[in-house]
Amino acid sequence: MIHPDTTLRFIDDEIGFGVFATRKIPRGTITWALDKFDQVLSPEVKESLDPIHLEIVDKYSYKNRKGEYVLCWDFGRYVNHSFNSNCLSTGYEFEIAIRDIEPGEELTNDYGYLNLEEP
């Protein structure tokens, strides 16, 4: 579940949507956590999907440390990549703010820490 003090905003045609803070989110705050509404798919289930659903999973999911694909039910799926990210995945199904995130600032994550082929 994405932090409640966020909103979804269209950025542009190339990037699409992003998640933005509506209030200050202090450093160390949990910004996203896996919850029961998120879909967790095994690689076998993912590969059995029809092309339309497979495209959605490929675009919006990430691979967890078990090699499963996690598809967020809320707009947590729209957190964009940045090499200078303000959020960090812990590897334990939640993310934290690694610095203060100001109102109007986009929440970002460094995708380099996600979707690793090997733990």
Which residues make up each language-model segment?
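Conserved catalytic SET/PR domain of SAM-dependent protein methyltransferases, capturing the structural core
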Residues: 1-119
